[in-house]
Each structure stands twice: as structure tokens, then as C-alpha cells.
Amino acid sequence: ELRSPQEARANGGYFNGPTDVAWDPDGNIFVSDGYVNSRMVKFDKHGNFLMDWGSLGSEIGQFRLPHTMVVDRAGEVYVGDRSNSRIQVFDSDGKFLRVLLMNVPYPSDYQPPFTGINAERTGRGSTQPWAMCLTESTPQELWVSDADPGRIYRMALDGTILGWLGSSGRQ
């Protein structure tokens, strides 16, 4: 249902830089309101506001840019918290479940394109999840794109890295 800005604000539907949308198995709608509000918002399948969670920060349940998300068959919500270099997993009511990290070594000849990246000191990077999708297979797998070092990660839902494709560079 389309709402006026005043109605939307009162019902949790006032966004500032939303970055992604996903649905759970029950049809509930999740929106990552990332660039300014640093929160997740949940609506029922009719667009009625149910709840929101999160705030700006780096603690569990906080976000520094919830940029991408997916919902698995069990209704768990995977939020790519890009600027905190992690994926946070929540139940469908916003209860924190676990953190997934893509902490794999960079190639020895890798040159980070930005300053301040950990790779220069440790050989491991601060990966940043940019986009995610889930397979339809059983068990489901999570595929995550990462801007630096330019990889696509294949992950089990418990966070185990199953492999990756690509490397940073230009065509």
C-alpha cells in the first residue's frame, strides 16, 4: 500500500538510502535501510510495518552499512554489513544468531587499491560484502561478492568458505 511520507514515517517505512529488499518464506518483506539509517526494517506481506532493528556502530546488532541481504529457507536473515567487513545473521524477528567472515589470505602479489587496507600488514584483507545470493540447492549455499580483493565467495550457511572465484584487476 502506498503511503504519504507522514504515514510512512509513523509506520517505520521512512527510508534514507535503502540498499536491498528480500522476502522470507512467509512473505514478510525485509529492507536494509543502509546508507543513513543503518537499520533493518520488517513489513508483513501486505506492507504493514512490523519492526526494525539496528543502529550505527560496530557492535553485534549494529551496522556501518547494511548493503545487501538474503533470507534462507529457514527464515534466517543474512545482512552484508559492508563497512564492518562482516555478514550478520539474525532470525526473522531480528535476534542475532552469528557472524560470518570472509577472512581468507590475499595473494602474495596483491596490491590493495585503497589505503588503510589490512592486506599490506597481515596478508589478510578486510573484505566487504557488496551483494549476496542463495542457491536453491540442498543444502543452500551463500554466494557473496567482495569489492576488495574482487572475489566471489562460495560459503556454507555456517560461514565455512567453500571456495572463491576471481581476483582484483582490470579487463
What residues fall within each predicted segment?
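Eukaryotic scaffold repeat domains enriched in small/polar residues
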Residues: 1-171
